[in-house]
């Protein structure tokens, strides 16, 4: 190929012996650089995995779900559905109308209480959880905004602008809705309540708060990954570190189910 999807035999104006000149010309426009190559001052992200203990009720629900296809009134169909319910129980059993507090929600509340002046972005893959979290924040008079798929573009821009201008310190975002086209470099911390492939979407979400100018490079850049200890939540983190795909994570979960049934 010599450019624009054409081969030598297809390219009408190809001049024999001019391949090198053409390639040099194209290289001026096709060079891809990583941001780190262009902005060498980019700060390092400090990542912390926060392992939280499962509640007694969470343990019960997860054990039942691994040993059969249901827990309480929740009946699953297939491995993927089982994995989704498993992840939701780890995040907040209330999503499924199950009785149990959410250790992850409590950790977030404690973080905000202890760091009231820290601009923070909270990411979740589950819109149902975001709605539950917003209800909790309203009840506790915590100022925030939330960006999910149904938020109109103009409203989304308004939320971003207000956060960047410091009108509030908490912004909740659906991971897939906020993985790109958002500049939120006022934030000093990111909290991931739950993680799932693709790893590229997670990395894009992480980049939302990276300093965009050199004068902001020294601000904190801390990423907290909330994980339920002694659960498949921990396995997901490890698999993501190995850049595993969604299919590979699902297959790994299937294997864990097979082991638990032996």
Features from the language model and the residues they span:
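Short beta-strand segments
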Residues: 51-53, 87, 119-126, 146-149, ...
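Inter-lobe coupling linker of SF2 helicases/translocases
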Residues: 1-103, 110, 114-118, 223, ...
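Conserved nucleotide-binding/hydrolysis micro-motifs of P-loop NTPases
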Residues: 56-58, 127-129, 152, 177-179, ...
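Conserved phosphate-coordination/catalytic loops
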Residues: 77, 98-106, 124, 150-157
């Amino acid at each position: 190929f010599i450019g624009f999807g054409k081969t030598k035999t297809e390219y009408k104006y190809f001049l024999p012996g001019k391949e090198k000149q053409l390639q040099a010309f194209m290289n001026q426009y096709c060079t891809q650089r990583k941001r780190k190559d262009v902005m060498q001052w980019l700060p390092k992200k400090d990542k912390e995995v926060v392992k939280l203990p499962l509640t007694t009720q969470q343990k019960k629900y997860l054990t039942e779900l691994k040993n059969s296809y249901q827990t309480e009134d929740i009946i699953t169909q297939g491995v993927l559905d089982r994995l989704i319910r498993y992840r939701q129980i780890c995040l907040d059993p209330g999503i499924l109308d199950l009785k149990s507090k959410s250790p992850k929600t409590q950790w977030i509340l404690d973080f905000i209480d202890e760091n009231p002046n820290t601009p923070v972005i909270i990411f979740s893959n589950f819109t149902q959880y975001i709605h539950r979290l917003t209800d909790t924040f309203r009840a506790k008079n915590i100022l925030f905004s939330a960006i999910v798929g149904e938020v109109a573009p103009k409203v989304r821009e308004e939320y971003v602008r207000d956060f960047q201008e410091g009108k509030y310190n908490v912004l909740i975002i659906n991971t897939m809705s906020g993985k790109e086209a958002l500049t939120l470099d006022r934030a000093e911390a990111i909290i991931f309540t739950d993680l799932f492939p693709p790893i590229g979407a997670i990395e894009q979400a992480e980049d939302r708060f990276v300093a965009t100018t050199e004068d902001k490079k020294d601000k904190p850049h801390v990423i907290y990954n909330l994980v339920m200890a002694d659960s498949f939540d921990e396995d997901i983190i490890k698999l993501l570190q190995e850049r595993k795909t969604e299919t590979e994570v699902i297959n790994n979960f299937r294997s864990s189910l097979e082991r638990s049934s032996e």
